[in-house]
Amino acid sequence: MSSSSLKINLQATPTGLGAWRVSFLSLTLAALVTACGGGTSTTAALDPSAPGVTPLPITPPVVNPNTSTTVTPGVYTALLSGKEVTSIVMRNSSTNSASAQLYALQFSAPFDPDIYAGSLSGIGSNSATISNLTYFQNVSGTLRTGSASLTVPSAGLLKTTVSYSATPTEGARDLTWFANPDNRLKLDTPALLETIEGKWVGRWSYAYGYIDNFSLTVSDTGVVSSSMTFQSDCQISNGSVSPALGGVNLFSVSFAVPNATQCFVRSQNLTGVAYVTSSPASGKTQRLQWIATTADGRGVSFRADR
């Protein structure tokens, strides 16, 4: 196939909030992109229809992402090529209100995601940009760098566009998705340690593999610990969670990994975000989502229901 761009248009609703409507042409083009190597491909999810979860009222000064026409902190969800995409925008500066961090999980399989991360400039305006976006691919562990932009084409709709230049082994890539706020998260509820405190058991994903029934414990003071290892000898050390900046219902997370022969993040510090929503799983009431990355973008994710 030539290196000309292909564009795939999908009509989508956010994850768990509605059904996909995909045209036959979209499916045909998706098959062509899968079958042909090289070149630049553009995959786009169109403006999703109204979500099926009623938005909860938001108390100022927290900005309501359902009614805002600017890029604001929060959790946003969509479906792309039939798979979940979750984006988290979190302030990272107490002095610069326009600065934030983006973390995003793109699931190409039911459970284990690719991880995007980067510093945002332009929060509070209609458009924010990332010049240092990293893309850590599940399974292969390939790390790529690129750029991204976040815009709000209409109230309650976050458009994310990411771009990567070609490498010797991979073609250039442009990817766009539209997402709605995750209304299972009461954004203006204070991020209290008592919400995240306790034992969580779920799926720990780290690109080269995963662990089901991974156990993580958060103390009443925000200390995070686990007796389990991943990738043979990666161990969580000096873990902590604390309320994020801006009074939103997000947590800042961090932990260190000691030096270990087989560990892909050995001798590294990881930082990221966590949040607790209502759980869609039968018999469960809470869901924890956790993402943490190294300075260069390699990372892990953890999802647990209790």
Residues of each region from the PLM?
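Bacterial Sec-dependent N-terminal signal peptides
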Residues: 2-12, 25-73, 184-185, 303-306
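Tryptophan-anchored aromatic micro-motifs
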Residues: 50-87, 158-210, 285-304
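N-terminal glycine/threonine-rich, aromatic-flanked beta-hairpin/loop signature
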Residues: 66, 72-126, 202-258
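N-terminal accessory/assembly segment that mediates macromolecular interactions
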Residues: 82-176
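Extended lipid/amphipathic-ligand handling interfaces
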Residues: 90-91, 118-121, 148-152, 183, ...
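An anionic, turn-rich surface loop/hairpin at beta-sheet edges
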Residues: 130-146, 251-272
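Hydrophilic extracytoplasmic domains
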Residues: 261-306
